[in-house]
Amino acid sequence: ELARQAHVRNVLVSAGYVNEKPLRALCQWLDAANVDLKAFDDGFYRSVCGATLKPVLEALRIMREEGLWLEITNLVIPGLNDDLAMVRRMATWIRQELGAATPLHISRFHPQYRMRNLPPTPNEALLRCRREAQDAGLEYVYVGNVPGEDAETTLCPRDGYPLIRRFGFTVQENNLKEGRCPLCAQTIPGVWI
């Protein structure tokens, strides 16, 4: 509430595992959310996360219904959730349930904590996943955790003009003009500062 009064934007980063009532109450104070959709497979959620997929999908639907700007991150782990058919199912669900303009961040896995035995995600695998999600109809698909990759750039879906160039977590160039492409005036969805 204090942030709202001070005109400060509130963003939630979450695994999406939250009950409906507290989520709806929280949404009134949020402007945006980024949810980690770990995989589009209940078996993965059960074996790797000790959870289930359905509550995460329901949380995503609720956030969209509540009017939040929503972005999704999928950490691609070699051999566990990098199956292209699963990526296509996930992207299709996102397009159908949340909208084609919902950004999807395909992120590189780095061996850490309990998964030190697995290799980092190859760049080629990330780019294949990105193409699969784009082919399923998502307009804004990015590759993350690979600074310098061209797939970090936001392109106008109408004319392909580079709107926002990033390097890792740094915005290097922002060509948006009042939330629109400067060439064709296409409105670019998002929460702009």
Language-model regions, residue ranges each:
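Conserved AdoMet/S-adenosylmethionine-binding subsite of the radical SAM
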Residues: 1-121, 129
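Auxiliary Fe-S-binding modules of radical SAM enzymes
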Residues: 79-193
